[in-house]
Amino acid sequence: MQSKRPIIIGIAGGSGSGKTTIAHEIYDQLQQDDHILIMTQDSYYKNNDNLSMADRKKINYDHPDAFDMPLLVEQLRQLMDYKAVEMPVYDFTAHTRSEKTIHTEPADIIILEGILVLGEENLRDLMSIKVFVDTDDDIRFIRRLERDTQERGRSVESVINQYLATVKPMYNQFIEPTKRYADIIVPEGGENDVAIDMLTTKIRSVLSTVK
């Protein structure tokens, strides 16, 4: 029976804001002292294998309904109980969940990053520290364009069309408003070394109270 529970750090912000960079900066600074797990909300998009490819491409991936939040909460709670989980893998080329899973062991620090990780109360309630990464719209778009064309096999035109049709409106409607739930707001994303250092100091402080 474990006498303590992992601490959960939620990192939210728009696509391309620097969430992943910050998560890995924290990992690099703390990994020598603690076992750390990074989880991404992108892994928990709903399984769309019942839809045609044409219909999958029409899905609004920046809307809260695109995510399998019950599964995310369930697996996060299992990890908090120090139980391993089979984490889903999302295939961004096929626009659906892969048949593969990743066997994931629990850790003392769990960093959960994603556009809407602060959007649901039952998920926020599991977090010890809530972070919102606030980055200029133009910078976020350029980063998303580079990522989706280089890593996800997208065309420039499709990325631009998606940004104008869903990404920007969904950011304004659903993502940016979750900033009010954050304990810490990090401007300029992964480029803000001072904020990242302050964040790791805060995490160490929280850790010292549960060890």
Swiss-Prot record:
GO terms for molecular function: ATP binding; ATP hydrolysis activity; cytidine kinase activity; uridine kinase activity. Its main location: cytoplasm. ATP binds at G13, G14, S15, G16, S17, G18, K19, T20. GO terms for biological process: CTP salvage; UMP salvage. It is found in: Cytoplasm. Keywords: ATP-binding, Cytoplasm, Kinase, Nucleotide-binding, Transferase. Pathway: Pyrimidine metabolism; CTP biosynthesis via salvage pathway; CTP from cytidine: step 1/3; Pyrimidine metabolism; UMP biosynthesis via salvage pathway; UMP from uridine: step 1/1. GO terms for cellular component: cytoplasm. It is an enzyme of class 2 (transferase). It catalyses: uridine + ATP = UMP + ADP + H(+); cytidine + ATP = CMP + ADP + H(+). Its EC number is 2.7.1.48. HAMAP family: Uridine_kinase (MF_00551). Belongs to the uridine kinase family. PANTHER family: URIDINE KINASE. This is Uridine kinase. The lineage of its organism: Bacteria, Bacillati, Bacillota, Bacilli, Lactobacillales. The gene is udk.
